[in-house]
């Protein structure tokens, strides 16, 4: 299961109970789980049945670094809006949550967060810690895809 992020993912995916149930089911089956950018937040809220901890507890997970968070207003326009589907006027004061901070809490004392503020296309950040493939943001999207191919080729 692969989830891609972006600024809308905190609203649509991260807090979505259906997404959490899918992640929990795939995790219980030992399936590979991938998330890019803010979609990594969905891992935080998916829980292990045996102890109620996040499925990423004790893991090394890549997260969008807090240095990249911003507090300027972030609109969520609907592209190609029509009179029948006009969209919303939703605006949040920056990102909905600080991803690095919530991932740090979820991985706990035995895990670690990989958040590299200097990441770019030439120095992307993607990591695998079974069963999780995670990557930082759009600059790491190619590395994320490459890491998924590498991991799935070994299964």
Label the model's feature ranges.
Residues 2-34, 39-155:
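Active-site-adjacent pocket-lining segments in enzyme domains
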């Amino acid at each position: 299961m692969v989830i891609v992020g972006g600024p809308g993912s905190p609203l649509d995916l991260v807090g979505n109970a259906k997404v959490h149930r899918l992640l929990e089911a795939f995790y219980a089956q030992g399936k590979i789980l991938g998330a890019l950018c803010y979609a990594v937040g969905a891992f935080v809220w998916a829980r292990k049945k045996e102890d109620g901890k996040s499925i990423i507890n004790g893991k090394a997970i890549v997260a969008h670094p807090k240095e990249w968070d911003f507090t300027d207003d972030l609109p969520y326009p609907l592209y190609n809006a029509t009179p029948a589907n006009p969209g919303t006027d939703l605006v949040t004061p920056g990102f909905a949550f600080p991803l690095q901070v919530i991932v740090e809490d979820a991985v706990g004392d035995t895990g670690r967060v990989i958040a590299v503020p200097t990441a770019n296309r030439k120095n992307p950040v993607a990591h695998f810690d079974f069963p999780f493939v995670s990557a930082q943001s759009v600059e790491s999207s190619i590395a994320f895809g490459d890491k998924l191919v590498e991991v799935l080729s070994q299964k």
